[in-house]
Every structure is written in structure tokens, then in C-alpha cells.
Amino acid sequence: MNQVQHNAIVNFIWSIADDVLRDVYTRGKYRDIILPFTVLRRLDAILEPTKDKVLEMHQKLNEMKIDNQSAQLRKTSGYVFYNTSNYTFKRLLNEPGNIRQNLETYLDGFSSNVQDIISKFKLRNQLETLEEGNITFPLIEKFCSSTINLSPMPVTDKDGNVVMEGLTNLGMGYVFEELIRKFNEENNEEAGEHFTPREIIRLMTHLIFEPLKGKIKDGTYLIYDPACGSGGMLTEAEHFAKKLNPKATFHLYGQEVNPETYAICKADMLIKDE
């Protein structure tokens, strides 16, 4: 992802707050909506290509009276998470009059690992406020805009030409970090409270792994960050370590006291199948 694409995505998502949330939320509360909906839209875009196949498999398993469906649904979605509701962000827009109820159904359709993310964001607590302010529809509509692409797949025209590049997991991580930084500035919070700048992360990973050059053999290694924030340190450490030995396997572990940044980190890990 180049800087132009990065800035366009961040600026568009940032503009949603002023365009939709103003007069319903104070500026200090914008992050309570924008961050979880950004995460959900990313997950939604990732699952969209296999959505109908997941629904078909879910119906088939129900007809067979199979209760433990998780493994098969993960396999069908292609990821370690899935959604069994009939809705996507775009399909929610088809019934404006029932959008609150359908949004709840959509949230309930996610697998348990995504339910944890939704819970940490306390997103369900916001649904009544969104409904009372009549902004649920315009909020989802904005996140479905063709102006940005939060999917890892590129957008092409009818001739197959790429008109908008896909957003990689690393690029999505940068978007999250920039949004958090901007919200921190709005709320006069310390810049490093929720994430560490990438330049510092790269320096730290170099200091840790440079002495280990030639010592990382084939096998499985665990990387642990006891205060992982949004997961940037873990991602960069794995990226650097794999350069030292592409044949080695690395598993990432971390803990985080802030529920919001924990949710962002977990979403990133789920997408990357960590």
C-alpha cells in the first residue's frame, strides 16, 4: 500500500465521523463507533467472497442436525472466523426500516472469536444511540462506499483492469494505528499509550534479532509481547524473524489490558490466522 492509498483510506474513514456522528456523539466518543465499524467492515469484506457458500454449508449442517459446525464453517469461509447470518454490510442496506434489528442479527451471526472482539468494543451498547439518532443506515452506507477498498482483493473494472488495489493485512494495521493516533490527539491522550510507532518497532526487532542471525533453525518458535497494544510489535517481529529463516514457524502470543486495542489486535491476528 502506497502513502496515497493509505492517506485516502484514513481520511475517508475519519470523515465518516464528522459526516455521520456529529450532533449524536461528542468528538471524544467518535472512536467508540469508528474503530469497531472499521474492524467489522474489514472482516465483512474478507468474508464476502465465500458468504453464500458459508450459508449453504450452515443450512446443510442444520438439516443434518450437526451442532458442532465451527470447523466446517471455518474451512468453508477460508478463515478461522465466519458469519452465519443472511447479511453483509451491503445487504443490510436493502432493508432500511429494519436495519437496527438486522444489524443485531448480523452481529449475532459471527463466530465466537469475533463475538469476543464485539464484546470488547462494547458495540452492542451503542446500537440504541445509533437508532435514536437515525444514523445506523448512513453509517453503514458510508462504510460500503466505493471510494475506499477495505478488502484484501483488488477492485477491477468490467475489463479486468485494477482500479483500486487490495488492502494487505500490514496496510490495514497501518490504517488502524493512524486512526488510533488521530483519536488520541483529539482526546489529548499520550501518543504512545495504545501503540508504538513502526520506526521504534523496527529498531527494537533489529536489536533483538540481529544477534540471532544464523541461530534460528528450522522448527517452531513462540513470540510473546506482554503489553501488545494493537499487535504491531508482534507482526513486525514475525516479519523480521521469517526473513532470517523462512522455513521456521512462528506463533504469536500477547496480552493487553485495554479492551479496545485488544479487540483490534485480535481482529488482526484472526485475519492472519495466527
Question: Where are the regions that the model predicts?
Answer:
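Conserved S-adenosyl-L-methionine
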Residues: 194-274
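Non-catalytic, mostly N-terminal accessory regions of nucleic-acid modification and defense proteins
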Residues: 1-212
